[in-house]
Amino acid sequence: MSNSHPLRPFTAVGEIDHVHILSEHIGALLIGEEYGDVTFVVEKKRFPAHRVILAARCQYFRALLYGGMRESQPEAEIPLEDTTAEAFTMLLKYIYTGRATLTDEKEEVLLDFLSLAHKYGFPELEDSTSEYLCTILNIQNVCMTFDVASLYSLPKLTCMCCMFMDRNAQEVLSSEGFLSLSKTALLNIVLRDSFAAPEKDIFLALLNWCKHNSNENHAEIMQAVRLPLMSLTELLNVVRPSGLLSPDAILDAIKVRSESRDMDLNYRGMLIPEENIATMKYGAQVVKGELKSALLDGDTQNYDLDHGFSRHPIDDDCRSGIEIKLGQPSIINHIRILLWDRDSRSYSYFIEVSMDELDWIRVIDHSQYLCRSWQKLYFPARVCRYIRIVGTHNTVNKIFHIVAFECMFTNKTFTLEKGLIVPMENVATIADCASVIEGVSRSRNALLNGDTKNYDWDSSYTCHQLGSGAIVVQLAQPYMIGSIRLLLWDCDDRSYSYYVEVSTNQQQWTMVADRTKVSCKSWQSVTFERRPASFIRIVGTHNTANEVFHCVHFECPEQQSAQKDSSDEPGTGGASAAGQQLDPHALQAPSGSSLPSSPGSNSRSPNRQHQ
């Protein structure tokens, strides 16, 4: 026996879902004029409809058809002047069925349809139509799409249009759609730093727009041109004959160009958010430095003493360096570099950017700090074409080594103070390349692994002998730090005393917490005036149980959301359970182990000058 019904969506037993049938039956009312009690007239075409359905689906029609106005009269005809018959047909189908087919429609119809969705208050339809328009952007339709998206304040569609135009700026300038842009939309486009076309091309396109829009204020439009970015020849032979800019404006531009630093000019640059542009895909290349090919190959795993890095000799006048040329001027605010880290060495360095290789602006200065492994660097956004990394110090030899380099623009929020990041999240983690460089533990970085529950009498802590040594944590790079948090070993009732110091170079130390005369247990929160720090040293001065200072966990800055009550689970062993089996003094030298005097004593320390 045949079944005339289409396949139905699966529903759980006890649930009936026939929404698709309801949609079909209500949609069938559009085919004829049965039961219709209102008619819309669009482009001389009549559209019979049903008041109750329109009112149920749309607040606008509810007010129009039941608000006591002329349109609420029985059998009323309502003319609509601000749309097309094609777009209104699509809207009625959506109102009656919840469905709309976009793929077969022209861009002009889709934009009219989007306008109706906005006017009549269908936010879900507005979003879905915007998402589809994002997928079909091209040179011919992007300008009119941007105009509509700007008019109706559609952020996602506006953003996608801007990104498309930024990446195709010169083609957009020469398109027919550019001439039909509204003045507001036009200025929103060309005032963007990321609209990276040559300034001469922008000027000529605006000149053409002014000819096609003679009623607009041309002076306001021409103010969007960045005259100092144009050459003297262009100013005299292209701008001056147009007559749209005064001689004084041209002379001022020449003056700014001749008297300003090159990097102070308001350059335009390509903007590709959240994507590394220091790649061959985007035309980047290493133009200075030794072993150039390794730096941008994307391999951050396969490197050792002899290969997998770029380098330059460290000299006193800082003339050497590793220089990257980007494929085109670009806007960046984030750089990541991987310093060679197969041993415990540290480096110092600075980074500069330029547009012409003559005028350099320093964006990162870590020349007075010791740094290791991955460097995650942030700075105010800059347009640049060249990036230079200059090593100033290596704790092992006179060679500066970089394994990988990345740069991009990121929308991630960050705070800088004195040129250093003020971290919001814990940066004393293994993932952030922090390490314990002094202290005794079964596992070198147990202090930083984030485990604050699984510790006992015999493992998962870091310690040092009172009166000798300390526990020292090295962060991968300097940060502005104003708080730290410790978990002292608390499987019994013992208490500790200690103090904390910070440093940027392991030579000069500043005490930030003095708890030598305080009995301290379990979680310790330490806050102090924010200051630069690459190293944190924790020195125990007293333990009521023995002559060893034990710490289970360290973080900086303090993560308040992770605060643990010291009365809850003082360790997996617990004082009572573990105390029945082990002597607390065993913490000085855990049974069955032979702990090194420092975690790094077994690591290689190559001193090969040719590395």
From Swiss-Prot:
Q: Which PROSITE patterns match?
A: BTB
Sequence ranges of Low complexity compositional bias: 586-611
Q: Where is this region: Disordered?
A: 560-611
Membrane spanning stretches: none
The BTB domain extends over 36-104
Question: SMART domains annotated for this entry?
Answer: BACK (SM00875), BTB (SM00225)
Its GO biological process annotations read: adult locomotory behavior; circadian behavior; modulation of chemical synaptic transmission
Checking InterPro entries in the record gives: BACK, BTB/POZ_dom, BTB_POZ_domain_cont_9, BTBD9_BACK-like_dom, FA58C, Galactose-bd-like_sf, SKP1/BTB/POZ_sf
What is a single Pfam family found in this protein's UniProt entry? BTB
Instruction: Name all BACK domain ranges.
Output: 142-240
Could you name the Gene Ontology cellular component terms for this entry? cytoplasm
The name under which this protein is listed is: BTB/POZ domain-containing protein 9
